[in-house]
Amino acid sequence: MSRTVIGVMGGSSADAHTLAGARELGRLIAERGWVLLSGGRPTGVMQASVSGAHEAGGLTVGVLFDDDRAQAAAGLDIVIPTGFGAGRNVINILASDVVVACRGNGGTLSEIALALRFGRPLVLLDFDPGRDFLDACSVEGSESQWAIAPDAASAVAQVSIYLAAMGR
């Protein structure tokens, strides 16, 4: 019988609260005998969750963005270099029995969408990917890149505002 794989997704940069939650999550996954799968980078939620699982004696797998094993998180037992860039997110989701998403940015949002698309059960750890998430995904230093419109007329009005800001 194959082992249960829990995919832990989240930002490459994160605040202390998110990192502590990811580390605790990794520990709890390991204590249950589940395999922790992550994006495998040595930063943010990926490193924190791997560290928690590794310290608890769990098995950890990292599916890397690039083909450089030197970019792997400390504590990974299995490193899978892909060279697929963001395409590796599909592998992360399909290889997971259940996906847990921690606070992140655009990559995490794509993993959430892929989990839903491929029918993987999804748990959001201590965040709501609404307004805060959209703000986090926006290009730093720019005006707001998103808006919520209650009706079609308001949507067109907001489009006009964006176009005017672009000089169009």
Where are these regions (language model features)?
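Generic N-terminal amphipathic, Lys/Arg-enriched alpha-helix
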Residues: 2-16, 27, 31-32
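Acidic/glycine-enriched connector segments
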Residues: 20, 27, 40-113, 117-118, ...
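Short active-site oxyanion
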Residues: 33-36, 144-146
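Conserved beta-strand scaffold positions in the cores of enzyme catalytic domains, especially
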Residues: 79, 122, 146-148
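A charged, well-structured terminal subsegment
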Residues: 98-99, 146-168
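Catalytic binding pocket for nucleotide-activated donors in carbohydrate/polymer assembly enzymes
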Residues: 130-145
